[in-house]
Design a protein with these regions (language model features):
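A sequence-level/structural motif corresponding to short, flexible coil/turn segments enriched
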Residues: 1-398
Length: 398
């Protein structure tokens, strides 16, 4: 995530002693449970500050669900706390949302009380100092404006809009019919306050417009809400199995990315995959289909720049067909696409002998792409799990 001043924010979990350049972070040597780190770097990669949070409860697994930066440089962090303490304040075990100042001081902590499980999967700044939270839950939760109930034995998707003080403006919940599910995996907000959500559903679901129905285990969807949370439009990639795990917005464009198998039609053109492949689909702000691309790679994260160009990151097994010259060895890729037709402007590939993962991408005001992810280590056969990965930050010129 990139702040307005070009600084780079990152949040992750760690299981080994860690030093990001400012000295060793706190580490509980008697626990193999995940720790959590949030850090801020300068545009040149110099550490400004970092917080390492140690687990106090082995029964709750720490998790990073989302990271966002508002226009003032405040940092919003969402996920699951394992009984963390930051400064003199506690983050009780369970789902949490916290706001940190640009200097890293903890300012606010918000919880969503209830029963069952809740996963925060994505955050997006709303342009007014607040944040929009997306995820899924089971059981019952109080989102601040109402108590929401997921059908017994099912997971339902939720979106909550909060102001800069962490108070709820509105919340929305979507549940599937019968034995289905709905999960929200990504969220973005445009300059007019419109909220865009992507994820997957099974069975049948009504987001506020015509009902969507699938016979697949999971089918990708995208939807738009007004600034007040009213349904504007909803779409799915009918005929496919997969998840829309990324979304980004530009001038009159909504870009949706993820992975799929099966076949879908976009503007009358078929996109077919017998195994898991990546896709990017572009809509205009009214939900009209503009273009789509599918390719032999994952589509992990999306970001747009001031020109509306789309930056896409993921991993591939050597069959990348986004426009890389020559045979591209398996590894990571970063691609920039034209917003009008999806044509590749440039593609960079980075080979790796292990299985790399690109987790997020952002573009700063200068057009630099910043990618965060993880690299798998090579272990001897029989090494027990969990097997730690090494995190990385990568900054590319425009």
């Amino acid at each position: 995530m990139v702040a307005p001043d070009g600084d780079v924010l990152v949040a992750a979990t760690y299981r080994e002693p860690l030093d990001l350049g400012g000295g060793p972070l706190p580490f509980n040597h008697v626990s193999n449970a995940p720790h959590l780190v949030v850090a801020r770097f300068s545009p040149g990669g110099t550490l400004r500050w970092a917080h390492g949070l140690t687990p106090a409860m082995a029964s709750t697994r720490a998790r990073v669900g989302g990271l966002a930066v508002d226009g003032e440089g405040n940092v919003w962090l969402g996920g699951t706390s394992a009984g963390f303490t930051l400064g003199a304040r506690e983050l009780p075990a369970g789902p949490f949302l916290a706001r940190l100042s640009p200097q890293g001081a903890l300012e606010r902590v918000r919880r969503f009380d209830g029963e069952g499980t809740l996963a925060i999967n994505a955050l997006a700044p709303d342009g007014t100092g607040g944040v929009v939270v997306a995820g899924d839950f089971s059981g019952q939760r109080h989102f601040g404006d109402a108590v929401r109930q997921a059908p017994e034995g099912q997971r339902s998707a939720f979106v909550v809009s909060l102001d800069g003080h962490g108070q709820t403006r509105w919340s929305r919940v979507w549940s599937a019919r019968a034995e289905g599910l709905v999960t929200a995996r990504a969220v973005a907000v445009d300059v007019f306050g419109g909220v865009y959500v992507t994820g997957a559903y099974a069975g049948g679901v009504c987001f506020g417009g015509p009902a969507l129905v699938t016979v697949r285990q999971r089918t990708p969807f995208a939807l738009k809400l007004s600034p007040e949370g009213a349904h504007v439009w909803s779409r799915d990639l009918r005929g496919t199995e997969g998840t829309a795990s990324a979304v980004a917005v530009g001038p009159d464009r909504v870009f949706v990315g993820g992975n799929f198998s099966g076949r879908f039609y976009f503007r009358g053109e078929p996109h077919t995959s017998s195994g898991a492949q990546g896709f990017v689909a572009a809509f205009d702000a009214a939900g009209k289909e503009r273009w789509a691309r599918s390719f032999a790679a994952t589509a992990s994260a999306l970001a747009t720049d001031d020109a509306g160009q789309l930056t896409l990151v993921g991993s591939h097994d050597g069959g990348l067909d986004l426009g890389a010259r020559g045979g591209a060895p398996a590894g990571l890729y970063v691609a920039r696409l034209h917003p009008e037709d999806g044509a590749s402007l440039w593609v960079r590939t980075f080979s790796s002998p292990s299985a790399p993962q690109a987790r997020s991408v952002a573009v700063d005001l200068g057009g630099h792409a910043v990618v965060a992810g993880a690299l798998a280590r090579i272990y001897p056969e029989g090494t027990p799990y969990p097997r730690p990965r090494d995190g990385f930050l990568l900054r590319l010129k425009p």
